[in-house]
Amino acid sequence: MSFVGGGSECSVNGNAVAQFNKHTQQDRSLQQQVANQHGNVAQNQGFKKDNLMNVRDRANLDQFMNNGAPQNSFQFQPMRHELNTIQNQPNAIHQQQSNWSQDFVAQSPSAQITTPIAKTGSPVNAQWASEFSQAPATQQHNQRPGQFGPRLGGYRPMMGMSMAYQSQPQQQQQQQHNQEPQVDWENQFKEIEELTNKAEEVEEIQREQSPEIVVDDKYQATFQEVWDSLNSESFENDFINQQYEDFKRTQKDGFPADMNQWEKDFAKYASTRAHFGDYQFEDKQSNQFLDLPKDQDPYEIGLQLMENGAKLSEAALAFEAAIQRDENHVDAWLKLGEVQTQNEKEIAGISALEKCLELHPENSEALMNLAISYINEGYDNAAFATLERWISTKYPQIVEKARQENPTITDEDRFSLNKRVTELFLNAAQLSPNQASMDADVQMGLGVLFYANEEFDKTIDCFKAALSIRPDDAILWNRLGASLANSNRSEEAVDAYFKALQLKPTFVRARYNLGVSCINIGCYKEAAEHLLSGLSMHQVEGVDTVSTLNHNQSTSLTETLKRAFIAMERRDLLELVKPNMDLNQFRGEFSF
C-alpha cells in the first residue's frame, strides 16, 4: 500500500506533490489586494508592485472612458475615481522585500483564500491537496460513504461485485482566519522533499528487483492485436456459446431417460460453474479430535461445541474428524459445510455441502445453504437451479404442475430462470396463507431470489416473515442485516447483526458484516475491533495456529481490516496486517 507516489497517484492529477506545487504557484496578487483593503495592508508586496500609471497610459484610459456610450451602460468614471483613491493611499506603499519566500510566509490567512480546481485522485491525495490549499475555515467535506456489501450469511458482496472501498466521511475542521497559526512552509517543503525522496527510493528498488524484459515492436503489436480480440464482446459471446454447445453435445446422451427436467437443469448449471475442488482437511497434528477413543463420537462432540457456544473453528475440526472416520457421514458433511460458511470460509463450506449432496441429493438443508453460497460467489444460475431442486424436493406437486403446464421450458438466461423459480416459490407460499402454517424456508428462498434481482425491500419483507416464525434464528437475523445494509440502511443493519451475535456470539460472518457496516457509517475503530474479534475466533486454543492451521484460510477479514486501518490513517497498524499475524499486538489499543 502506497500513500503517495505510487500507482495512479503518480499521475499529474493524482500526485499530491504535483497538486501542492500547482497551488503554491498560483498568482494570489488579486486576492491579496482585495483582502488588504480593510485595515492594515499586509507586508507581502513581493508578488505585486504598486506602480503608478504613466502619462501616456492615463491618456489612453481617459480616451477609453470618455467615449460615447449608451445611457443605460455601466458607468466606469466613479469606479476609476475609487481605484485612483485606493491606489494612491499612503499606507499602501511599502518597500519591496528581497526574499520572496519570506514574503510568501508572511501572507495573512485571509489573503490565501482560493477555490482550487477539483482534481480526481485518491482520498489521501485529496486530503493533502485541501490541506495545502488552505480552504476557507467554514468549509467541510462530507462525502457519502461507499459500501462494501455484507454477506447474507453467505451473501456475496454487492451482488457479486468486488468489494470496493470508497472514501469515508472526512470532516476537515479549520479555525477562523484570525485564529489560524502561521504555517511553517520551510518544514512543509522539507517534509514533502523527504516523502518524494522515499518514494523515489522505493521505485528504484522495485525497478532493480523486477526482471528486465525487452519486447520488440513487432511482438508488441501482435500481442496487442490478440489482447484486443480477447477483450472484445464478440469473442466473449462466441466463447460462451461455444462452451454451451460443447456441453450440450457431451450431455446429449448423458442424461437418463427417466431424469426429471429440474434434475437436468441442475446438472447443466452446476456443471458450468467453477469447480471448487475437494475439501481440504487440516493437518493431523492440528486436529486433537482425531485421537479420540473409539467410544467417543467426534460428530456428537462437534454438535455439543456448537450448542455450548464454542468457536466454530473447533467445531469444524470435530466434524472433520468424524468424516475422516467415515467419509460417507452425510450429517457430518452437512454440519461442516454450515459451520465453515458461518465461519467466513465460503469455499470450504461449498466443498463440504457439495459432498453432502453427492451422498444425499435431496438434502433440503444442504440445498438451501448451497444456493446461498452460490449467490455469494456469483453463480446465479447454479443458485437458481439449486433452489428449484430444493422446492422440487419439498413441494414436488408444485413443480410437476408447472412442468405439465409448460413442458417445453428451456430457460437459458438468468432472468428467465429467476422468474420461473420465483413463481414456484410464490405458489408454495400461497399454500400457507396464514402465519401459523407459513414455511419459513419458503420465505427464505423467496428472499434469496429477490436479493439476486436487487429487490431488497421484498427481500427484507421475506426475511422478516421468516423471523416471525423463527425469532431466535441467528442466521436469519444476519441475512436480514445484510439485506438492510444493501438497502443503504446501515444503522438498522447494525441492530440486526447485534441481535444475531446476541444469539450466537461466535458467529464470525455476522461479526464480519458488522465490521463492514461500521466502516460504512464511519465507526472505524469499532469496525477494527469486530474484525479482530472474528480473526481471533479462527484460532484454536492449544494449537499453534501460526504454523499448523494452513488450510481453508479466509482473506476477507484481513482485507477489510486493512481498509479500516486506512480509514483511520494508521499506516503503522496497516503494516502489521499479514498472514499468521500475532493478534496480541493489537490488544493494547483495541478491545476484542
From Swiss-Prot:
> Which segments carry the TPR repeats?
295-329, 330-363, 440-473, 475-507, 509-541
Annotated PROSITE patterns: TPR (PS50005), TPR_REGION (PS50293)
Molecular function (GO) terms for this protein are: peroxisome matrix targeting signal-1 binding; protein-macromolecule adaptor activity
Q: Which UniProt keywords apply?
A: Cytoplasm, Isopeptide bond, Peroxisome, Protein transport, Repeat, Thioester bond, TPR repeat, Translocation, Transport, Ubl conjugation
Q: Where is this motif: WxxxF/Y motif 3?
A: 185-189
Region: Disordered; residue ranges are 22-49
For this chain the motif WxxxF/Y motif 4 maps to: 262-266
The family note in this entry says: Belongs to the peroxisomal targeting signal receptor family.
Q: What is this protein called in UniProt?
A: Peroxisomal targeting signal receptor
**Protein species of origin:** Candida albicans (strain SC5314 / ATCC MYA-2876)
Q: Which gene encodes it?
A: PEX5
